[in-house]
Amino acid sequence: MAIVKCKPTSPGRRFVVKVVNQELHKGAPHAPLLEKKSKSGGRNNNGRITTRHVGGGHKQHYRLVDFRRNDKDGIPATVERIEYDPNRTAHIALLCYADGERRYIIAPKGVSAGDQLIAGALAPIKAGNSLQLRNIPVGSTIHGIELKPGKGAQIARSAGASAQLIAREGVYVTLRLRSGEMRKVLAECRATLGEVSNSEHSLRSLGKAGAKRWRGVRPTVRGVAMNPVDHPHGGGEGRTSGGRHPVSPWGFPTKGAKTRGNKRTDNMIVRRRK
């Protein structure tokens, strides 16, 4: 993995910083694990914008990633290759199981082509192996963590993400997340050892607005630059600060206001995030 800073041969190249990984597969992805991915442009079935700043971008295929790994317990798998996935910040690994089936998983850091991985209670403590939390030693770094047994990984899936298993008590284990939050999760839930690959993703710089458009992201217009009919911060003579605490276009507090509303699981959070 190398960080490449481009020479300023043009305004669009001046600020480009790329992350180059020579281990990534340079050919086509595994066709049976691809699905059509249609674009909505941020519109719902009525044609109205429900998600702002979405539209355009390069056509993509969705890679079917196995977030469960619970039906391959005890079957060893060989990592065939590490691939780029346009749908996520992490890289993905193509596994070939001993029974001949191939599946994609989120590529753990340090795992490369030719490595042997396995899932199940008897799996050794090694990066890339998937176990129930009750079988993982306290202090281990993990990713791809389930919140409900059998539902599939939901926590720590993006590039460089991980959590630490810090305690085990009864049917629950306690995790420390990267945000600083400490929460309890059922010990039956699964997780993968190690941290997610491509941790240098945060060091890249796209360099120009067009590179963002290639990824399907449209411009963000500030509320203070709009008219009063379009945003609560709009209008005024000359440049203004908005005249009130920051709010969304619909008047809800933003920029730091707490939005968590799921009180049902509050008792699972030991310490709130920082």
Curated annotation (Swiss-Prot):
InterPro entries attached here? NA-bd_OB-fold (IPR012340), Rib_uL2_dom2 (IPR014722), Ribosomal_uL2 (IPR002171), Ribosomal_uL2_bac/org-type (IPR005880), Ribosomal_uL2_C (IPR022669), Ribosomal_uL2_CS (IPR022671), Ribosomal_uL2_dom3 (IPR014726), Ribosomal_uL2_RNA-bd_dom (IPR022666)
**GO MF, any single term:** structural constituent of ribosome
Q: Which GO terms describe its biological process?
A: cytoplasmic translation
SMART domains given for it? Ribosomal_L2, Ribosomal_L2_C
Which cysteines form disulfides?
A: none
- Keywords associated with the record: Ribonucleoprotein, Ribosomal protein, RNA-binding, rRNA-binding
Pfam families the UniProt entry points to: Ribosomal_L2, Ribosomal_L2_C
CC terms in the record's Gene Ontology section: large ribosomal subunit
- The segment annotated Disordered runs over 28-55, 224-274
Relate the assembly described in the record: Part of the 50S ribosomal subunit. Forms a bridge to the 30S subunit in the 70S ribosome.
Family as reported in the entry's similarity comment: Belongs to the universal ribosomal protein uL2 family.
The job of this chain, per UniProt, is described as: One of the primary rRNA binding proteins. Required for association of the 30S and 50S subunits to form the 70S ribosome, for tRNA binding and peptide bond formation. It has been suggested to have peptidyltransferase activity; this is somewhat controversial. Makes several contacts with the 16S rRNA in the 70S ribosome.
> Could you identify this protein by its name?
Large ribosomal subunit protein uL2
Q: Which organism is it from?
A: Pseudomonas putida (strain W619)
